[in-house]
Amino acid sequence: MANTYKSIAVSIIFLLYFSCVSSQQQTKFLNHGFLEANLLKSGSSKIHPSGHLELTNTSMRQIGQAFHGFPIPFLNPNSSNLVSFPTSFVFAITPGPGAPGHGLAFVISPSLDFSGALPSNYLGLFNTSNNGNSLNCILAVEFDTVQAVELNDIDDNHVGIDLNGVISIESTSAEYFDDREAKNISLRLASGKPIRVWIEYNATETMLNVTLAPLDRPKPKLPLLSRKLNLSGIISEENYVGFSAATGTVTSSHFVLGWSFSIEGKASDFDITKLPSLPDPLPPLSPSPSPPVSVMKNSSNTMLIIIIAASAIFGILILSFLAVCFFRRTENFTGGARKFSHQTISSATGGFDNSKLLGEGNSGSFYKGQLAPTEIIAVKRITCNTRQEKTALIAEIDAISKVKQRNLVDLHGYCSKGNEIYLVYEYVINRSLDRFLFSNDLPVLKWVHRFCIIKGIASALQHLHAEVQKPLIHGNVKASNVLLDGELNARLGDYGHGSRHSTTGHVAPELVNTGKATCATDVFEFGVLIMEIVCGRRAIEPTKEPVEISLVNWVLRGVKSGNLLRRCDKRIKKKNLVSEEVLLVLKTGLLCVRRSPEDRPMMKKVLEYLNGTEHLPHDDYVV
């Protein structure tokens, strides 16, 4: 008996341990540069080929923002108490002509809706109406390079802690503590040099610490700002974390080179050698010229001619370079599908190296590739068995390349060599839906995201079936062929080009007999897929009890027993569920998987059901 108790205790410890590890994996990240980071960018923000994030350039009255692609859970799921969090990042502010402005902020916000926010002193987060409003629920740490007296700024080079507005509750001039000399040393924020920041919140002690240092210095023992602060009334269950910067009539380029974040534990440290380099600073302004005098006339004309000639030569060189790049990357265009050279595709994927492999399916393998420093692609490699198959596939590619819709993955072009075809797609950053549904390594999808994904897939299929010149059949509607972008919108991929290999559990009955895919077989597969999305399980799970092996039969039993709502994924928090939408989707799914293809709704009707513009037939869900 004692041994039994010991075994149980050990098992519990291991479960708790792996639960913590899993949670930590979901809420911890480290970015050396941002080329492959999962960021939601807006305004003037962009990622440069070197990997650094530019929030604003030196144009006036800009707002640039970049947030982590997923909201972060800040409450302990067991106690609902706020958790501790550390973050560290490296930034640089390069002033434009004249004085620098206005600054950047690290931000924790429940929403990414900053509509109406002003640039300049308001840092793209607030405006004159909502500044200081407790309903904002925003925490920011600002790095301000302009003194706004009306906002109680202490100087034009300070760090401040902001709650719900840009009037800081705590601020001080930018400096760092030198451990060797045991004194504070001034630090110019807009020096153009990289500065490292540590922001740490201890939930137990309700203490927020902010520490600064030059990039080449270790973390100081003493923080710059230390504020007793209970954030439980500010930070809600899930929040977005990221950066916001703004310019006004005075400007700066605001850069972020690296970012580390963690819930609980310790934020991962940077390897400084892996951080991207900053662009060269702008040359200083020349002093105003003296009034022209006659002896300078010939010299000025000569200089003007030299400048014009140099500009023309430079322009010709740039155009030549672009032309060479264009013709090297593309051989020709055939009916809308761009044809890439095999050398270009092979180089982009590292010779189809296994480290670039994204996944494999019945119809081909997918590889990640990089055409240019900021152009990431996905390449599908297909082997054709006959010349006729290859010819038919190329003809279909031309048609597919013309199909554009917000919920479909874009096909950029293709490459043909020997008996192989390579399809070049846009790369969708969050990859496939099945990773989120059937794995515990990623955050659990909220119901609001699942419902949006379902409607997105329906919209994509409706476009393929009825909104193109010639209807296109997908033939393989399943979770691994649905990709998610940075905002978790659905992007249906791998449509057309002979991908007629439906997965077990998704196959319509008539497809088994005829082998012919139709709009109705797509509808059947869609019905199974949306039940997977709601229930968080696969269509066929042989290890379950006999009555639960088939998802469709299990859901149908839920209808008959009056327990349909209990079929929903248990991992979704009940308070985030919309019961009416869950029931709507499951009942729509059952309509889509009816045995007779004539009894299944068209995708147009399915969209009307999901959008609430058409009522479901009354209790008519028997498959």
Curated annotation (Swiss-Prot):
Region (Legume-lectin like): 26-262
Residues holding ATP: 358-366, 380
Keyword terms, alphabetized: ATP-binding, Cell membrane, Glycoprotein, Lectin, Membrane, Nucleotide-binding, Plant defense, Receptor, Signal, Transmembrane, Transmembrane helix
Membrane-topology annotation of the record: Single-pass type I membrane protein
Name this polypeptide is given: Putative inactive L-type lectin-domain containing receptor kinase III.2
Disruption outcome: Increased susceptibility to the oomycetes Phytophthora brassicae and Phytophthora capsici.
Note on domains (UniProt): The protein kinase domain is predicted to be catalytically inactive.
Species: Arabidopsis thaliana
Originating gene: LECRK32
TM segment ranges: 304-324
Role: Involved in resistance response to the pathogenic oomycetes Phytophthora infestans and Phytophthora capsici.
Lineage: Eukaryota, Viridiplantae, Streptophyta, Embryophyta, Tracheophyta
Pfam family, one: Lectin_legB
Keyword Nucleotide-binding (UniProt): yes
Gene Ontology BP annotations: defense response to oomycetes
Cytoplasmic side: 325-623
MF-aspect GO terms: ATP binding; carbohydrate binding; protein kinase activity
